[in-house]
């Protein structure tokens, strides 16, 4: 028979062997956890002018990145659009466990390819990584980079945190900015004047450049697509963030829309309320300037005719027919004067 253990005399009870092993395992796990701890940055730190990051990496799919992204970021998707759709379908329609396994295979493969592009980076290289909301996609990439030894940082809340900052901060930036508006009819060189003002060292906000559009039915830029509404607002926010609010900002007058882009209501109202400088020149000179500036339309007359016909509800059948005749006869100066 085994002898009875001595009676309890007070003090700490001796730990059972299996409890000692369990505590040892937990201690080692905590140590590993501490070693793997990844730094997390708030959106305010990321947007600061002295942000300490060498690269900003967006690991979302290409279509998500194209819609909008943090300024200066590069797209290294851990799942492309097709893969993301495939994993999402598995998760919703088949089995979340199967979806996670499939996702792990795809993500691991893609991360390996991306890491190879950074193989020459020094150990001091500091990347910031984000996904949609700071979840599994960005954490997966960050964990691998962290284990390699790079001082990687995650954006808390991901792109959603950034978009919220845009929505909350843009109107206040607009209200805090003094605008001087350049007004005048089409063809009098407002955009050129704005560029000259910038060359003289003054602050300028070129909305048409941000929107990739010249602001009229004929204003689409050749071989350029307009950004999404979200990306335009990101560009606007980034431009205003770098403005010295103690000095005025020169801006060209615009309607409430530039192509498919809607100006924020507060910005449009600020343009209405701001001080204005009116410019003008002779009608013939404006027509000649327009023909030169919109030369891509004279080179693709079929496209120009299609655009002109979109104005029929505003100008009537007879006027449209006259403009179409100008196009057919390549009377571009007459068309510009009439428009």
Where do the protein language model's features map onto the residues?
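Short, positively charged low-complexity motifs
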Residues: 1-2, 13-14
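Flexible, polar/low-complexity N-terminal or interdomain linker segments that lie immediately upstream
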Residues: 26-71, 99, 167-175, 179-183
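Positively charged, proline/Ser/Thr-rich regional signature most characteristic
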Residues: 50-122
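Catalytic cysteine-centered active loop of the rhodanese-like fold, especially the PTP/DSP P-loop
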Residues: 102-156
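A short glycine-rich beta-strand->turn/loop micro-motif centered on a GG-aromatic cluster
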Residues: 128, 150-164, 206-211
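Glycine-rich phosphate-binding P-loop
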Residues: 180-199
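Conserved nucleotide-sensing/catalytic segment adjacent to the nucleotide-binding pocket
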Residues: 205-269
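Conserved NTP phosphate-binding and transfer environment spanning the P-loop NTPase/kinase superfamily
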Residues: 269-276, 280-339
């Amino acid at each position: 028979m085994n002898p009875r253990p001595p009676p309890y005399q007070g003090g700490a009870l001796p730990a059972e062997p299996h409890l000692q092993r369990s505590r040892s395992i937990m201690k080692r796990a905590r140590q590993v956890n501490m070693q793997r701890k990844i730094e997390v940055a708030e959106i305010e730190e990321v947007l600061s002018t002295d942000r300490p990051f060498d690269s900003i990496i967006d690991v979302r799919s290409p279509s998500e990145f194209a819609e909008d992204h943090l300024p200066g970021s590069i797209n290294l998707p851990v799942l492309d659009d097709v893969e993301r759709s495939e994993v999402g379908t598995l998760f919703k329609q088949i089995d979340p466990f199967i979806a996670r396994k499939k996702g792990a295979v795809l993500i691991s493969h893609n991360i390996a390819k991306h890491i190879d592009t950074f193989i020459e980076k020094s150990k001091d290289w500091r990347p910031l990584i984000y996904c949609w909301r700071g979840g599994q996609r960005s954490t997966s990439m960050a964990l691998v980079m962290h284990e390699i030894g790079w001082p990687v940082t995650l954006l808390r809340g991901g792109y959603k945190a950034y978009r919220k900052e845009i929505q909350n901060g843009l109107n206040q930036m607009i209200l805090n900015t003094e605008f001087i508006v350049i007004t005048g009819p089409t063809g009098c060189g407002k955009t050129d004047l704005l560029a000259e003002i910038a060359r003289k060292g003054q602050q300028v906000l070129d909305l048409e450049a941000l929107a990739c559009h010249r602001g009229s039915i004929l204003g689409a830029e050749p071989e350029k697509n307009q950004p999404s509404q979200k990306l335009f607002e990101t560009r606007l926010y980034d431009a205003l963030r770098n403005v010295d609010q103690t000095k005025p900002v020169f801006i060209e007058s615009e309607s409430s829309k530039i192509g498919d882009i809607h100006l924020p209501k507060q910005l449009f109202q600020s343009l209405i309320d701001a001080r204005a400088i009116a410019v003008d020149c002779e009608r013939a000179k404006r027509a000649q300037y327009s023909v030169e500036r919109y030369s891509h339309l004279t080179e693709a007359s079929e496209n120009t005719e299609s655009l002109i016909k979109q104005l029929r509800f505003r100008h009537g059948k007879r006027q449209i027919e006259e403009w179409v005749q100008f196009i057919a006869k390549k009377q571009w100066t007459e068309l510009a004067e009439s428009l």
